[in-house]
Every structure is written in structure tokens, then in C-alpha cells.
Amino acid sequence: MAKFQPRIADDGRDDGLKEKMIQVNRVTKVVKGGRTMSFAALTVVGDGDGRVGMGKGKAKEVPVAVTKAMDAARRDMVKVSLKNGTVHHNVTGEHGAAKVLLAPAAPGTGIIAGGPMRAVFEVMGVTDIVAKSLGSSNPYNMVRATFNALRRSTTPSEVASKRGKSVEEIFN
């Protein structure tokens, strides 16, 4: 199995998005006539300002699989509200047996996250965060759990509107 090798891909597009390949896996389909080899790629793209997407692509050749994954990631982007380069509050996310814990960090802390989570935060524009992964270390499940956690994060104004209060009342 291919290990986590972050790198920024450049396929000639000029849409201002950062791209990172998380994993490329050689997969095999066994048929009556023998084995059919193909490649599966897992990638993330982000604009560096809170928008991030993940994609998976399969093809007979690695570059085609990576291109398909990048296109899929561009189509499935989510917007996450950031505060000074970090998340607003502690949040957890799960996918399968993977569980991730995300916590805001003080400026200058950096990205303290392992494996595929780091790539997600780098392309998203997060500069300071503490993240811990529990359970499965499968890169796909870890990225999906990270996305689930990011989707669950809320801004103070969202919390205030749900409670029918002002933002100042929430902090006091």
C-alpha cells in the first residue's frame, strides 16, 4: 500500500486552488482471464481560505486517476468558517472506525496533525490547529472523518441565532 506522500500537483489549471495527493493505491480486479490492474487516487483541493474538497479517482494509469480525483474534489467542496487560521471550537468527526478530534490552537502553534489530516488543513488555509486521530488509520476514512468534523463546526453567530441571543450574550 502506498504511504502518505503529500505533494502539490500541477495539471495546468489556473483556478487558484491548492492540490495535494494523499494516496495512490494499486488495486486488482480478478477475472476469469487473469488480473486487471488499476490505480485509485485520493486527493484534496482547497483555496487557502476555508474551502476544501476531497476526491477519489480510479483509472488504468496513475496520472489519469489523479486527474479524475482532482476533478471530483473540485465538484465536492465545502466552506468552513475559520477564526484567525483555526477552527472556532473543539469538534469531533467520525467515519467508519476512524474518529478525529479537532481543537483550536493559539497563533504560532502550527498544524499539529498526523497523516492525511495535515494535507486537508494545509490546502484549506488553516495555520494553527491541534488534531488527533483515533481508531482506523485508513487515509480515506481519516479524511472523511475530518470533513465530517469540519461540517459540524459552527460559528458564534450561528450559535447565537439558534439560541435567539446576540453574539455578545453568548460570550458573557
UniProtKB/Swiss-Prot annotation:
Tree of life domain: Bacteria
The GO biological-process annotations, alphabetized, read as: translation
Q: Keyword Phosphoprotein: yes or no?
A: no
- Keywords for the protein's UniProt record, in alphabetical order: Ribonucleoprotein, Ribosomal protein, RNA-binding, rRNA-binding
Q: Which GO terms describe its molecular function?
A: rRNA binding; structural constituent of ribosome
UniProt GO cellular component terms? small ribosomal subunit
Q: Does the keyword Ribosomal protein apply?
A: yes
Matching entries from InterPro entries are given as:
Ribosomal_Su5_D2-typ_SF, Ribosomal_uS5, Ribosomal_uS5_bac-type, Ribosomal_uS5_C, Ribosomal_uS5_N, Ribosomal_uS5_N_CS, Ribsml_uS5_D2-typ_fold_subgr
Q: Which family does it belong to?
A: Belongs to the universal ribosomal protein uS5 family.
**Function (record text):** With S4 and S12 plays an important role in translational accuracy.
Give the domain section of the comments.
The N-terminal domain interacts with the head of the 30S subunit; the C-terminal domain interacts with the body and contacts protein S4. The interaction surface between S4 and S5 is involved in control of translational fidelity.
According to UniProt, the name of this protein is Small ribosomal subunit protein uS5
Species of the source: Methylibium petroleiphilum (strain ATCC BAA-1232 / LMG 22953 / PM1)
